[in-house]
Amino acid sequence: CELLGLDYQDSYDYDYNAGMPSNKIDMSAFEFIKSRTDIFSLLEEAILYAGVENEFKQSGMTYLLPTNTAFNSETSTDLSYFQTHQLTYIDEETGELVSYAPISMTAYPKEQVKEFLLYHIVKGKYTFTNLPAEPTWFETVATADTAKINMYLLKDRNPNIVFNNFDGHYKSSIKPRTSNLYNADGSYMHVMDSWLDRPTKEQLNMK
C-alpha cells in the first residue's frame, strides 16, 4: 500500500468486503499536512500565515489539498499558482515594471490566501461512494457567493474524481493524485497537484 507515499491512484490495498481502499489516516487534515512537508510545506506555510489552522481540524468536510507542485511548478502546462499570479515591482535602475513569480503564499495579502484556502474545503463528505456521475456544484467554506466547487465521479476503467471541469476554468479535467483518504476527524482528503479557481457568476448562471 502506498497511501502515505501518495504515489499512485491505483496503489491502494483494497478491502473487497467494503469495496473501498484501506484509506484511514489517524490524524487531522492539518496534522497530515504537517507530517508531509516534502509535498505540503507551502500549504502548511499558507495555513499558518492565514491563521486558519482550526479550519483544517473539522469533521464532516472534504479537504482538497494542493501540493507544492500546485503552487510552484515552473512547467508551463502545470499553470501553477505562483506562475499564474505573478507580482510586480519597479526596477530602480530602469524604472520598468518587472513581473516575478513569488516563492511563498506569504507574498500575497493575507485575506487572499485565507479565501484561497477556504475555497479548497468543501462542506460535507464526498468520495467515490457518494459523488454523482454528472458535474455538480458544492458549497465550500469560503465566503464569496461564487465560492463553489464542481465535482463528479468519472466512471471509467480507472474511476476518479474530476474537479472544476467547466468552460473557462484555467485547466480542465483536474484529478487528484491520491484520493479518498479518511482522517481522524471524520473528513475526506484528496491530494492534488493543481489548485482550483472560483467560477464567475456567469459560469454559475447567477444574476
Residue ranges of predicted features:
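Mature, structured domains of secreted/extracytosolic soluble proteins
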Residues: 1-207
